[in-house]
Amino acid sequence: MPAFSATVNFTDYSRAYLRYTETLRYPSIFEGIYGFSTAAGSFNRMGYGWRPEHAKNWEVGYIHDLTGLLPKMKKADFRINYFHNKTKNVIDRDSNLEFEQFDRQIRSGAELSTRFDTGRVFGSLNVFRSLKNKMCDETFQWSTVTAGDVDATYFAETGKTMSRPVCNHGGLSDSGYLASALQPRWSIDAELGSRFLANRLETGVRLHYHSRVYENRNDAWQPNYNIFNQYRGTNHKPQYNDMRWQPVAVWDAYLRYKIGKNLTAELVGSNLTNRYYLDPMSRSYMPAPGRTIRIGITGKF
């Protein structure tokens, strides 16, 4: 598959890059056979045989080494980048629990990564902003929810056809896996630590924060469902059981002591505030572990 990259060095400390790659992913065994919770149904849709997913990925970024301005720093740099990925023939489940291949999935986002290290104090900050995550299909929209009699009645009264969204945020089907595989709009990871006793003792704290998913398929499909409910006297909603998570900040801390050249002891506390939450992109409603304390010794031989 084609791939290329280009880098421009502005100075000894700064550069920009452009990267393009293409990849193929063939259907897995789980996606290509009949079994529990799945059925290989792509041949039911005319023109859709099994084909590999074909991704075209663009990334552009800027990297700057700050040690030229801060010579006493051992490390000090940042990177900012933007990516845009388009995948054709995306595999996902439909409302009949059958795997189908849909036209395309488009994902884009921006990232900022920065770090510093003075020798005594060190830290890092990583920020991710999800800009777009949608799946599109020109024909699947007509195989969902609205019955033909409603279409005919609406056309007879208005002279218009009922429009359905071609693209949906996340996935096209409530029963699909991609509908819950949505990255939060914001994700932030930060770390701050320090070293003592001739670097034999290291301690630090870590923060992980993610926001909620702000977009869903309700906004795109609600006008269509309003018409359907009006003609059928029902109260159907576009979104039934999609998983959603709330924003959460999780704090961890650790203490690491180098006993000898090949022996290290560590004390780690995870989720110190004992938050009850779901990890983003969870496949189930199993919550993340609560407050956890771990003690360990690692030896190298």
Task: Specify the residue positions occupied by each region the protein language model found.
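Gram-negative outer-membrane beta-barrel transporters
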Residues: L70-T87, E100-D219
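Transmembrane beta-barrel architecture of outer-membrane proteins
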Residues: M1-P2, Y20-L24, P52-W58, H64, ...
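Surface-exposed extracellular loop regions of Gram-negative outer-membrane beta-barrel proteins
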Residues: V8, D12-E59, F78, Y82-F102, ...
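C-terminal beta-signal and adjacent terminal beta-strands/loops
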Residues: L24-R25, H208-R232, W245-V248, Y254-F301
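Outer-membrane beta-barrel strand-turn architecture
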Residues: V8-D12, H54, H64-K72, K86, ...
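Signature of Gram-negative outer-membrane beta-barrel scaffolds
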Residues: M1-S14, N126-L131
